[in-house]
C-alpha cells in the first residue's frame, strides 16, 4: 500500500567529484532528466551528453545550464553535447549509439530516464504500442548497443560503468493481474500490442514491470566489476508527466501533486543516489527512494515469473533481428 505522504529524503553526501567523468542522460531536455543533468554538472561532471528527441530544445537547455549559478561556481567550463535520440524509433536508437561509440571514447554513466505515459493507444514505426516501445523496447536496444562500449570504458578507467534506469513502484500494479491478463499461449509483446489489452491508466505500470523484469534477467549475466546496473523509483515528483491527462483529471491530480509530490531536486537526489552512491550491492536491484528492496510480490508470483521468462526470450529474439547482440544477451 502506497503511503500518501512521502518520507523525507536527505541530499546527496558531500564530496562527490565527477571531474573527468562522462554521463549520458536520456530524456534530458525537461523534468527529471534536466534536473539530473544540472545536479551532475554541479558535481563537476566533465562531459554531459544530453540525449533528446528535440535537438533545438536540447540546445536551449545548454544555455540554461551554463547560466546556472551552481554550475558556474563549481564547474564553469563543462563540455555539454546534445545528441538526437527518439525512443519511438529503433533506427534513431541505433544511430545514436553508433555516433556515441564513435565520438565518445568512454561513458562512465548511463541514466535511462526517457519515458512516456499516454491514455491513447498509438503505434510506433516498429508496430509496437508506443508506450511499450519508448519505455521498454528502445531502452533494451540502447543497452544492448552500448554494453560493449561501457565495458571497454570500464577496462580503461579501472572502475565499473553504471547504468541506472528510472523505474516506478507502479510496476507492482499492472493490468495483467485483473483487467488484461496475458493468456498462457500469448506472447508478452504480442499482448502489449493488442489494442483490446490496452488499459489506459495502467499501461505505464505495465511497461515499468517489463523494465524491471528485464533488468532482473540481465543483471545476473553481467559482471558488476565492469557494469553495475540498477533501477529506482523516485516517487511522485512535481514534473509535467500529468500533462497527458484530460483537463478535469489534471486539475485533481495537480491538487494531489501540490500536497504530495516531491520537488524535482529531491527526485534528482534519489536518481543520483542509485547512479553514484549505491555500491555494487545495488547491482540488479530495485531501489525504492534510496532503499534497496526485495523483489515485489508481483515479480515473485507465478504469473510474474512466467512473464519474466517469456519476456526475456521474446525480447532477445526481437533484438537479435536488429543488431548483433553482446554475449550477455544470448
Swiss-Prot record:
EC top class named in words: oxidoreductase
EC number(s) per entry: 1.1.1.-
Residues annotated as the enzyme's active site: 204 (proton donor), 208 (lowers pka of active site tyr)
Pfam families linked to this entry: adh_short (PF00106)
GO BP, one annotated term: terpenoid biosynthetic process
Disruption phenotype: Loses the ability to produce yanuthone D. Also leads to the loss of production of yanuthone X1 which does not have 6-methylsalicylic acid (6-MSA) as a precursor.
Any one GO molecular function term: oxidoreductase activity
Sorted UniProt keywords: NADP, Oxidoreductase
Keyword Zinc-finger: no
Recorded metabolic or biological pathway in which this protein acts: Secondary metabolite biosynthesis; terpenoid biosynthesis
InterPro entries: NAD(P)-bd_dom_sf (IPR036291), SDR_fam (IPR002347)
Usage in biotechnology: Yanuthone D is an antibiotic against C.albicans, methicillin-resistant S.aureus (MRSA), and vancomycin-resistant Enterococcus.
Gene3D superfamilies noted in UniProt: NAD(P)-binding Rossmann-like Domain (3.40.50.720)
Binding site for NADP(+): 57, 86, 113, 204, 208
Free-text function comment from the UniProt entry: Short chain dehydrogenase; part of the gene cluster that mediates the biosynthesis of yanuthone D, a fungal isoprenoid epoxycyclohexenone that acts as an antibiotic against fungi and bacteria. The first step of the pathway is the synthesis of 6-methylsalicylic acid (6-MSA) by the polyketide synthase yanA. 6-MSA is then converted to m-cresol by the decarboxylase yanB. The cytochrome P450 monooxygenase yanC then catalyzes the oxidation of m-cresol to toluquinol.
Family: Belongs to the short-chain dehydrogenases/reductases (SDR) family.
Protein name: Short chain dehydrogenase yanD
Amino acid at each position: 500500500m502506497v503511503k500518501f505522504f512521502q518520507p523525507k529524503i536527505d541530499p546527496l553526501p558531500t564530496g562527490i567529484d565527477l571531474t573527468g567523468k562522462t554521463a549520458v542522460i536520456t530524456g534530458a531536455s525537461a523534468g527529471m532528466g534536466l534536473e539530473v543533468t544540472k545536479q551532475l554538472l554541479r558535481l563537476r561532471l566533465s562531459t554531459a551528453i544530453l540525449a533528446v528527441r528535440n535537438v533545438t530544445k536540447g540546445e536551449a537547455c545548454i544555455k540554461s545550464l551554463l547560466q546556472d549559478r551552481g554550475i558556474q561556481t563549481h564547474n564553469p567550463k563543462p563540455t555539454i553535447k546534445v545528441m538526437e535520440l527518439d525512443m519511438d524509433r529503433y533506427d534513431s536508437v541505433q544511430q545514436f549509439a553508433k555516433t556515441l561509440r564513435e565520438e565518445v571514447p568512454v561513458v562512465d554513466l548511463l541514466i535511462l530516464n526517457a519515458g512516456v505515459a499516454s491514455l491513447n493507444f498509438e503505434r510506433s514505426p516498429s508496430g509496437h504500442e508506443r508506450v511499450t516501445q519508448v519505455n521498454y523496447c528502445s531502452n533494451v536496444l540502447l543497452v544492448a548497443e552500448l554494453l560493449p562500449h561501457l565495458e571497454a570504458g570500464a577496462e580503461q578507467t579501472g572502475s565499473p560503468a553504471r547504468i541506472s534506469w528510472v523505474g516506478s513502484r507502479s510496476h507492482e500494479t499492472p493490468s495483467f493481474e485483473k483487467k488484461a491478463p496475458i493468456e498462457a499461449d500469448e506472447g508478452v509483446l504480442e499482448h502489449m500490442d493488442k489494442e483490446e489489452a490496452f488499459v489506459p491508466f495502467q499501461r505505464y505500470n505495465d511497461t515499468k514491470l517489463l523494465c524491471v523484469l528485464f533488468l532482473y534477467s540481465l543483471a545476473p549475466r553481467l559482471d558488476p566489476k565492469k557494469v553495475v546496473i540498477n533501477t529506482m523509483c523516485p516517487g511522485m515528483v512535481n514534473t509535467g508527466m500529468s500533462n497527458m491527462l484530460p483537463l478535469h483529471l489534471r486539475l485533481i491530480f495537480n491538487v494531489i501533486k501540490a500536497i504530495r509530490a516531491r520537488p524535482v531536486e529531491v527526485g534528482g537526489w534519489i536518481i543520483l543516489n542509485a547512479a553514484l552512491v549505491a555500491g555494487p550491492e545495488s547491482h540488479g536491484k530495485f531501489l525504492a527512494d534510496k532503499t534497496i528492496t526485495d523483489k515485489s510480490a508481483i515479480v515473485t508470483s507465478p504469473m510474474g515469473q512466467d512473464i519474466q521468462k517469456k519476456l526475456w526470450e521474446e525480447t532477445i529474439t526481437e533484438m537479435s533481428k536488429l543488431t548483433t547482440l553482446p554475449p550477455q544477451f544470448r
